[in-house]
């Protein structure tokens, strides 16, 4: 595991209720975005003037995260480069009288960035990076897990990670996920979350008929997970129908064992950047939002 320490100038007290770790899986090849993802990692595709993944990082930092674990592919270099200091660039900006740009390229303050390498051979699926990170989550500890090819833009300066952590704590639970409210026309095209009367997770119904949909919330792949779910992600076999190691299988196993997962509603504009059309929509939307 590689680690970059970014100017740790303060010491923060940690409480039992503070979630200080986040896992961001970014090892995918981004095949839907080929050929550009042959040379640009999917999570580093620009939306506006920032890479996709940095919008996620900014959200979780606002929630108090101090350790960010990127699960990267074996050939990954760009995420590492983005989050470390570039001395030559800094020197150039100073010489050119562009010191006002230095804060834009400065390393994150008071945050440690870790890199875990996901092997290119072996299992495939969303539970693989979560299982790899399991050893860095202590018993009784909670961590955010956010997939690295999508984000929510919030013009209010708020944090979906902070909102989800507050919801989990308010319900006295140790796990939660955010649902993304979708338009009616999209409900038959996606997995829709079913909740119980308390607003806790029951299951995901894939592509339901509109009249049979239990809600308008799709899974946004934005989680608070406990150590037990991390271990389930590490140990469960591949899904027998699809042959992939799926995080939803670990979540379903946790529910089947009596676990309870809170469901919240994400705020902001959803930016899906894993497909050409989604990435273009995200850039168009950000251009409009930033122009206002």
Task: List PLM regions with ranges.
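Conserved beta-loop-beta/alpha segment of the NTase-like Rossmann-fold superfamily
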Residues: 79, 89-92, 101-195, 234
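Catalytic-core segments of class I nucleotidyltransferases/pyrophosphorylases
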Residues: 144, 157-158, 162-165, 169, ...
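N-terminal glycine-rich phosphate-binding loop and ensuing alpha1 helix
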Residues: 17-95, 99, 113, 157-159
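Short, positively charged and aromatic/hydrophobic N-terminal segments
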Residues: 3, 7-12
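Active-site metal-binding loops of divalent metal-dependent hydrolases
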Residues: 29, 149-150, 276
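A structural signal for short hydrophobic beta-strand segments in well-ordered beta-sheet cores
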Residues: 44, 193-195, 263
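Residues at the starts of beta-strands that form the adenosine-phosphate
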Residues: 21, 66-68, 142, 174, ...
């Amino acid at each position: 595991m590689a680690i970059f320490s970014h100017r740790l100038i303060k010491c923060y007290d940690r409480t039992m209720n503070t979630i200080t770790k986040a896992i961001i899986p970014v090892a995918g090849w981004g095949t839907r975005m080929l050929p550009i993802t042959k040379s640009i990692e999917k999570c580093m595709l620009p939306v506006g003037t920032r890479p996709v993944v940095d919008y996620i990082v900014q959200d979780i930092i606002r929630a108090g995260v101090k350790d960010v674990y990127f699960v990267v592919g074996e050939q990954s270099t760009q995420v590492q480069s983005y989050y470390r200091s570039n001395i030559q660039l800094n020197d150039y900006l100073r010489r050119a009288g562009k010191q006002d740009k230095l804060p834009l390229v400065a390393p994150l303050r008071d945050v440690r960035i870790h890199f875990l390498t996901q092997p290119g051979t072996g299992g495939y699926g969303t539970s693989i990076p979560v299982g790899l990170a399991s050893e860095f989550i202590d018993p009784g500890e909670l961590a955010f897990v956010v997939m690295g090819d999508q984000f929510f833009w919030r013009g209010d300066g708020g944090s979906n990670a902070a909102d989800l952590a507050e919801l989990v704590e308010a319900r006295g639970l140790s796990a939660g996920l955010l649902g993304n409210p979708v338009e009616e026309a999209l409900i038959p095209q996606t997995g829709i979350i079913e909740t119980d009367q308390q607003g806790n997770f029951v299951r995901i119904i894939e592509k339901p008929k509109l009249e049979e949909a239990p809600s308008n919330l799709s899974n946004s792949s934005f989680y608070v997970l406990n150590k037990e779910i991390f271990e389930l992600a590490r140990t469960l076999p591949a899904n027998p129908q699809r042959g992939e190691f799926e995080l939803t299988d670990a979540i379903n196993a946790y529910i089947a064992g009596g676990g309870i997962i809170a469901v919240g509603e994400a705020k902001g504009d959803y930016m899906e950047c894993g497909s050409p059309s989604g990435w273009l929509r995200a850039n168009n939307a950000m251009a409009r939002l930033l122009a206002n």
